[in-house]
C-alpha cells in the first residue's frame, strides 16, 4: 500500500475501461497502458471504486522516460471495470509491497557460498565469440514471483531454465537459485529441470540444415533487467547482428537484430515471450519447443499448444549429490500464424519450426512443479494438461482495454 504521497499539481488522467468478454473468470489480469514518454511522467495514482491500486511505471525502450504503466486486476466472466489513472510529473513517496524480484550478478570468486554473491548488475553486453556463462552467477538473469522462478542462460543457447517452489514466497534474493541444505530443510525451492542443449522451456533458436541452431554468430549479445517490480519483471535479450543462416556465413547486410522480452507478472505462473526483429526476415525460419523430459507424457492440440509431464534429475549426473528426481509439467502456446510445422518428439525435444508473422512472434511458456503445496498447483498430467487448455483459452481471448482522456 502507499504509505505517503506527494504529487504535482499538473497531471493527466485517463479513464480506463477493461472488459472481460469471455465466459470464464480472470483471477490475475495485468493491464498495460501506453503513456506519452515526452511528458516525462514520474508517478501515478490508479484507483477503482474508491480503492487505490499498486502500479508499475516502465521504460521499455530504455531512454530514461516511462512509456507505459501496468496494474493488475481480476474480472468475473463478462465483467466490465473502470479505472482512473492519474499521471504526475513529480515523483511520489510511494511504497508498494514487492510481488516479484529479478537479479543478475557477476560471480565474486572471493565469496565461496553460492547464495551470498554480491556483484549485482542490471545489464551486460558481450562481443561476438565471448561467452560469459561461467562469469555470471546462475549463468544469466533470474526472475520470480511467489509461485515460480525462471533464469535465462547467457550463452549461445539462451535457454530458459526453471526453479520450482514448495510454498508461495519470493526466494531468489536469499537462495540465488542455489539453496543450501538448511534452506532446503526449511522449505525453500530449487532448480527442478536439467536442460543441457535442449530447448528447455521454450528457448528460441535458429533453423538451418533441417536442424535447430544455437545463436552462435551474433555481433553483440545483451541481457538486461528492464523492470523488476513491484508487479512484474521484464528481461530483455538482444541479439544484434545475428547470422540466421548459421552454420553458413553471411555478409553484414543479411544479419538481423532480434529483441526478446520475457515478462513475468505477479500471481501468474506463465511468462510472455515477445520477439521483434530488424532486417530482412522474409524467409526467416526459427525453432522452439520443450525439452523432452525423460519418460514424459506429451500433450498437443496440434494447433500450437503443447505440453509434457515427466520426472528426471534436475542436474547433470556429476552434480546429482544432494538432489532428488523432480517431476514437472511444461507448456508452450504459439499462435497458429507463427507455426510452420510441429515436429514429432525426439530424444531431446518436442520441437516446432516457426516464423515471424507481421515481423513479430508472441508466444507464452509455463510450468508447474510437483513439489508445490499451495492452491492452484498440479500433481498429475491430466490436471496440468487441463490447465494448459484453459490457459490457451485465456491467451486467445484477451480482455478489451479502452482509454479516454479525462480533464481534472
Residue ranges and their predicted role:
Residues 1-16:
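Bacterial Sec-dependent N-terminal signal peptides
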Residues 12-116, 120-122, 126-131, 138:
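Alpha-mannosidase-like glycoside hydrolase catalytic domains involved in N-glycan trimming
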Residues 23-27, 37-42, 92, 143-144, ...:
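Primarily extracytoplasmic ectodomains and periplasmic/lumenal surface modules that are beta-strand-rich
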Residues 45-69, 246-253, 294-313, 332-339:
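Solvent-exposed beta-strand/loop surfaces of large extracellular or lumenal domains
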Residues 59-75, 330-408:
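Beta-strand-rich recognition/accessory modules
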Residues 89-216:
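Solvent-exposed N-terminal domain segments of exported/luminal and surface proteins
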Residues 183-265:
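Extended, loop-rich substrate-binding clefts of extracytoplasmic carbohydrate-active enzymes
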Residues 258, 264, 269-302:
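Acidic (Asp/Glu-rich), glycine- and aromatic
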